[in-house]
Each structure stands twice: as structure tokens, then as C-alpha cells.
Amino acid sequence: MMSILKNDWAPLLQEEFQKPYYVKLRQFLKEEYRTKTIYPDMHDIFNALHYTPYANVKVVILGQDPYHGPNQAHGLSFSVKPGVALPPSLLNIFKELQDDLGCYIPNNGYLLKWAKQGVLLLNTVLTVRRGEANSHKGKGWEYFTDRVIELVNEKREPVVFILWGRHAQAKKALITNEHHYIIEAPHPSPFSAARGFFGSRPFSKTNAFLQQTGREPIDWQIENI
């Protein structure tokens, strides 16, 4: 798995791959992928890092663990592969985006366009068993993704951290540099979206901050395929 990181994340995370927790995690994953259906595909596990090099990170949207239905997860938080129905949380994200910036709701939930503009779509756990949410929680991924968050926190350029829901907000302790901008709201899930996710306007707030700090705003519109 080490050779998967081909960009500037590789030297930054090199030490993590040698640590005892990761060696143990890798053994666990080998067995899981061999004996069960695990999402995403093995070659998609690190896509958040692959599509958004460290130097390019301007925004972080933290998710929990990958979608656990067939053909959904592909390594970017909240995103689904083209041709797959929009999960309810993602539909709510698009509804808020429509209210916030007037973007139309697209016919797909493939968020690669965001990743390529510097939006790090990071789950805190990078794998899951089919049909079993949180099944790979506590197996070691949290150490790895905490390190990713710490590395982004070390960036000199201000970064926007979008933390939806309690699970993501628990990572706030890792964001210690005051020049970063933290946006918090309830999770976009149907269970909590009406409690303050709708109307929170994270996309316009992010773009206003990026422009204030001299960077290009994000083009949030995901186009129809």
C-alpha cells in the first residue's frame, strides 16, 4: 500500500506506514479483503490524498467512514461513483448548496471536481465491510487520518475545515493554528439536517474566506453527466 501515495503526501506520511499500528492495520485489511466484501476497492482507499496533493489543500470536509452499499464508495468522503443514486446526506448537501449559491442539483454525486480544486474529502476511517457501518472503526485508521489532519493544520496557508456532526467536530482539538477557519454545523444526514445544517451556508462562507486570503474560490457546481 505504501507505493499508492505518489504525490507530496508520500514523504509526509512515510513514517506512519512503518508504525506498529499501521503494520497491524495492514494485516487486518489483507485478511478482510481476502475473506469479505470491503469498500472501497483496495486501489481507491487513498483517493482523497491521491486527488488532492498536500500543497493544494485549501478546504477539508471530514466524513466518518465510507458508504457501505455496492458501487458507492470510491475513497472521497460523501462522494459516490457516477451512475449511483444520491445518498440522503449528499442530497441534503446539494440542497444546501442550491440554497446557498444557487447551484442546481446534479444527476450524480461524483465529487472529483471538488477534490481537484483543493477540497480534501477525508473520511476518518478509510474502509468498511459491506452493509456494516463503522465495522472498521477502532482498527487503526483513526491514528492515520489524525496525522493527516495534523499535517494540514501545520500548513502556513489558511485552510477551511468543514466539520459536520459530532464525530467530525471531535477532531477540532487537532486544529490548533489560529489562522485556519473552522465551520461547524450538524451532520447533513436526514436525522439531523433540519437542526441547523440547512441554512448554515458553508459553501459561500468558505469562498468568502478563500477570497479574503487571496485564493481562488471553489467552483462548487457538480455538473450533470
UniProtKB/Swiss-Prot annotation:
Catalytic residues as annotated in Swiss-Prot or TrEMBL = D65 (proton acceptor)
Q: What is its main location?
A: cytoplasm
> In the Enzyme Commission scheme, what number(s) does this protein have?
3.2.2.27
DNA damage: is it a keyword of this entry?
yes
Q: Name one GO cellular component term.
A: cytoplasm
Please list the GO terms describing molecular function. uracil DNA N-glycosylase activity
Looking at the record's lineage, which domain of life comes first? Bacteria
Which UniProt keywords are given for this protein, alphabetically ordered?
Answer: Cytoplasm, DNA damage, DNA repair, Hydrolase
The family database entries (HAMAP family) matched by this protein are listed as:
UDG
| Similarity comment text for this entry | Belongs to the uracil-DNA glycosylase (UDG) superfamily. UNG family.
Cite the PANTHER family for this sequence.
URACIL-DNA GLYCOSYLASE
This one is known as Uracil-DNA glycosylase
